[in-house]
Design a protein with these regions (language model features):
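N-terminal Rossmann-like FAD-binding beta1-loop-alpha1 element of flavoenzymes
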Residues: 17-43
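N-terminal FAD cofactor-binding segment of flavoenzymes
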Residues: 36, 47-96
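Glycine-rich phosphate/pyrophosphate-binding beta-alpha loops
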Residues: 116, 329-342
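Predominantly flavin-linked oxidoreductase catalytic cores and closely associated redox partners
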Residues: 120, 124-125, 129-292, 350, ...
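FAD-binding beta-loop-beta segment adjacent to the flavin cofactor pocket
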Residues: 304-335, 458-469, 482-497, 504
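Active-site-proximal substrate-binding core of FAD-dependent oxidoreductases
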Residues: 331-337, 349, 353-398, 515-517, ...
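C-terminal auxiliary extensions adjacent to catalytic cores
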Residues: 394-450
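Iron-sulfur cluster-binding cysteine motifs and their immediate structural context
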Residues: 488-519, 525-548
Length: 552
């Protein structure tokens, strides 16, 4: 049975393990399951048009997860061919910059031995490895519903439904999709996954955790002047242009072929509803340091994705009746390192090993508490626990406290293996937003079309596409709240926090109305996270829709 009380009959396919999401976590789980038992039936469902189409990450990859999963990845041609050659960190002012010496940074912050990568390309390669082992990988298959057994345990998902009309009715070319049942179901949907969110709520997995915290990460791929390009150069910044308005910072990673990733992250616990994360990103590129790098270059692509930032304190239980949460579906990002892919891969491997052992014992559809224990007590938990104070110190006391006290906490963990305190996160990001009357409007420079770009122009470079005849996948719990609450109390922050220009208010006063341009959506999930009234619900559109990120 499904939670949706429809009378649609669907065919069912049976597997040992059903995995939702062809990201680093899901593909690692699939590979490890097949390594352990070549006869195990494993399927991976991916909502993107191809594997990697929806993958957006920095990324500087710590290969520890890949080393554990596929030790001979170098011989197999994994796309990790740009080792980090330099690593620097700056605090920016509007015109100047101050470098933080590497010597004062805790050793865990070093990127020595890491690689600048396109995680989309890494996932494409992982999918090839999985398919070579016999894993069935189905791109363009959006998992839209959970399937439960008579005991209320997760036993599968509904995937591949197409052809509903805009009003939700069944169209002429309707395809009901199918149910894919597994003895275990692994959810590797990434940040704020729609099915993951449901199981966290249904099974109260976050009962003993603090509210999850998030950031919105935006990224552009640039081709720059060869004279300015240094393969493997890694640079991070904090400070300007966010100042005291919000936490966050930038990353600048040099790949090969004169390509550079330019990214910007804004923590979503900001108070002032006039903060515009996207325009902050565009403003950042006009800093003299960035302008010098980008002048004469060309922006190639753009994307945006939410990031989990709660870490150790916000980690929910990762096992539930019938399945597990993988990677960022649970929240495994090490915030000061700006890395989560290594933990995602380690989580997939751990989930596969615990599921394999359970299946060998004849078990199925139970709660894999062994996996949750491994997440907390193994390498993932140790990685997150060591940096647990950085994000809450930043949120509660500002950048200086994060750099000094948070840095001291990391040094203590490095030297002594422990820190004497654990800071609390406090409010959710939605609850952190304050009424507009308590804040001043923030004026941002207009994009110049050379270094900086308006949202709609940039969204075209995400190569996003949605079938416009389908129902909008962005749902409102109450259609009146966007105007009555979002606009009248908070001055319409949805028109600013969305990095794709999905939301806008048309008209003024009593004539104001809320417009959802869902065809622009890049699936970042910021609206589902930051909406002060928690009135916007992100659901999955038809499979194959959304962004099509190349080399991102």
């Amino acid at each position: 049975m499904t939670d949706a009380a429809d009378a649609i009959e669907r065919e069912a396919m049976e597997y040992d393990v059903v995995i939702v999401g062809a990201g680093p976590a899901g593909l690692s789980a699939a590979i490890r399951l097949k390594q352990l038992d070549a006869d195990r039936s494993v399927v991976v469902l991916e909502k993107g048009s191809e594997v990697g189409a929806h993958i957006l990450s920095g990324a500087v990859l710590d290969p520890v997860g890949l080393d554990a999963l596929i030790p001979d990845w170098r011989d197999r041609g994994a796309p990790l061919d740009v080792p980090v050659t330099s690593d620097s960190f700056y605090v920016l002012g509007e015109e100047g910059r101050v470098r933080v010496p590497n010597a004062v940074m805790p050793p865990l912050m070093s990127n020595h031995g890491n690689y600048v990568v396109s995680m989309g390309n890494v996932c494409r390669w992982l999918a090839e490895q999985a398919e070579g082992l016999g894993v069935e990988v189905f791109p363009g298959m959006a998992a839209s519903q959970l399937v439960f057994d008579d005991g209320g345990r997760v036993k599968g998902v509904v995937a591949g439904e197409f052809g509903r009309e805009a009003d939700g009715s069944i169209g002429a070319g309707y395809e009901p999709g199918m149910e894919l049942h597994g003895r275990y179901v692994m959810l590797g949907e990434g940040v704020r996954g729609s099915l993951s969110k449901q199981v966290i709520d249904r099974f109260d997995l976050a009962a003993d955790a603090e509210p999850q915290k998030y950031g919105i990460g935006m990224k552009e791929l640039w081709e720059v002047d060869p004279a300015k390009h240094v393969p493997g150069k890694v640079l991070h910044t904090m400070g300007w242009p966010l100042g005291s308005n919000a936490g966050g910072g930038s990353f600048v990673y040099h790949l090969n072929d004169n390509q550079v990733y330019v990214g910007f992250v804004v923590h979503l616990n900001y108070k002032n509803p006039y903060v515009n994360p996207y325009l902050s990103f565009q403003q950042f590129k006009h800093h003299p340091m960035m302008a010098e790098l980008l002048e004469g270059g060309k922006r190639v692509s753009y994307g945006a994705r939410a990031i989990t930032e709660g870490g150790w304190q916000s980690l929910p239980r990762t096992a539930f009746p019938g399945g597990v949460l993988l990677g960022c579906a649970a929240g495994m990002v090490n915030v000061p390192r700006i890395k989560g892919n290594h933990n995602a891969m380690l989580s997939g491997k751990a989930a596969a090993e615990t599921a394999h052992a359970a299946l060998e014992e004849g078990r199925g559809s139970d709660t894999l508490t062994e996996y949750d224990r491994e997440v907390r007590e193994g390498p993932i938990g140790k990685d997150l626990k060591a940096v647990r104070n950085v994000k809450p110190l930043w949120s509660n006391y500002g950048l200086t406290a994060s750099l000094t006290v948070g840095g001291a906490s990391m040094w203590m963990n490095n030297i002594f293996g422990w820190s004497p305190f654990t800071n609390a996160h406090g409010k959710s990001d939605a609850d952190s937003t304050e009424p507009a009357k308590d804040h001043k409007v923030i004026e941002y420079p207009k994009p110049d079309g050379v270094l900086s770009f308006d949202r709609l122009t940039n969204v075209a470079y995400s190569f996003t596409n949605h079938e416009e005849s389908q129902p909008a996948h962005l749902k409102l719990r109450d259609p009146d709240k966007p105007v009555e609450v979002d606009l009248k109390i908070y001055a319409g922050p949805s028109a600013r926090y969305c990095p794709a220009g999905v939301y806008e208010f048309v008209g003024e006063g009593d004539d104001a109305r809320f417009v959802i341009n869902f065809q622009n959506c890049v699936h970042c999930k910021t609206c589902d996270i930051k909406d002060p009234a928690q009135n916007i619900v992100w659901t999955t559109p038809q499979g194959g829709d959304g962004p099509n990120y190349p080399n991102m």
